[in-house]
A protein has these predicted regions:
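Conserved Radical SAM active-site core
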Residues: 3, 8-10, 15-16, 22-25, ...
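Short, basic/aromatic-enriched C-terminal tail that caps enzymatic domains
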Residues: 1-26, 242-261
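Aromatic-flanked redox-active Cys/Sec active sites in thiol-based oxidoreductases
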Residues: 45-46
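Conserved AdoMet/S-adenosylmethionine-binding subsite of the radical SAM
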Residues: 84, 105-261
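A short catalytic or substrate-binding loop motif that flags glycine-/basic-rich loops and adjacent residues
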Residues: 34-36
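Short secondary-structure capping/turn segments at boundaries of alpha-helices and beta-strands
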Residues: 27-32
Length: 261
């Protein structure tokens, strides 16, 4: 089976020179969520079913921080076995792999096969799937250790101010599939202004059952330090007031959000 990768593909890889994070070995740090700071290797797939935009406290608009992964053009198509081999060969001491995009679940069958191959190729490997939650896949849910769901309020997911039936159904399927473990799923919300709480977070949580057993993570909007700094106070205040976890974006703090980090 073949899988479409973004231009980053498996990253960051060391080929005799420093990687984008300035290291001489392959890997980076997970920048977000409950595993923030965890040494990891990333696999970025190509293609996304959303075109996200976010608004900040000053009315500024931020867009997807990985636009190069929105479409399949500009990347490569490889056999799952080839991707697995590259990952395993560059893991070194790493025990965490992150499957991200784009939206990986557009290639659910290939993702399931890749995760199964990775687990067979390296004992004790932990796999995180990063997804917007619009597409559920039972095989993928069974194959990964952590589902990192980042819900989005876009025209494809919300209708007349409420989350669509299909979106709620898909998110609920993810929650139900991972209900056996608290750290098997996280709900990671990008926050740019206070209105995001009543426009995105509360409507979604009120439509879902059993979300309380999983971590809710609040993350400031911004693929660059200037935008992120402006939204941090809102995210911090919301996390404290609601008793949720706050996450930084280490890839922005440490490396300016540049590609390959």
């Amino acid at each position: 089976m073949r899988v479409a990768l973004s231009s980053e593909g498996v990253f960051p890889l060391a080929h005799g020179e420093a990687t984008a994070v300035g290291a001489s070995v392959s890997g980076t740090l997970q920048g977000e969520g409950i595993l923030v700071g965890m040494p990891s290797l990333f696999v970025r797939l190509a293609g996304c079913n959303l075109r996200c935009e976010f608004r900040g406290v000053d009315g500024s608009v931020a867009y997807c921080d990985t636009p190069h992964a929105q479409r399949t053009s500009g990347g490569s198509v490889q056999e799952v076995a080839e991707v697995m081999q590259v990952v395993v060969e560059h893991l070194g001491a790493l025990r965490h792999v992150v499957i991200t995009g784009g939206e990986p679940m557009l290639q659910a069958e290939a993702v399931a096969e890749l995760c199964q191959a990775l687990k067979a190729g390296r004992d004790g490997l932990h796999i995180t799937l990063e997804t917007n939650g619009t597409i559920f896949g039972e095989e993928v849910a069974e194959a990964v250790d952590l589902v990192s769901v980042s819900p989005k309020r876009q025209k494809e997911t919300f209708v007349e101010g409420r989350p669509s039936h299909d979106y709620v159904l898909s998110l609920q399927q993810w929650l139900d599939a991972k209900r056996g473990g608290r750290d098997a799923l996280q709900l990671k919300f990008v926050v740019g202004r206070r209105e995001d709480e009543v426009r995105l977070i509360d409507p979604l949580l009120s439509a879902l059952e059993g979300w309380e057993r999983f971590p809710v993570v609040i993350m400031p909007m911004g693929g660059d330090s200037t935008t992120m700094r402006a939204s941090e106070p809102v995210a911090v205040e919301m996390a404290i007031r609601r008793g949720w976890r706050y996450t930084p974006r280490l890839q922005v703090d440490l490396w300016g959000g540049r590609k390959g980090t």
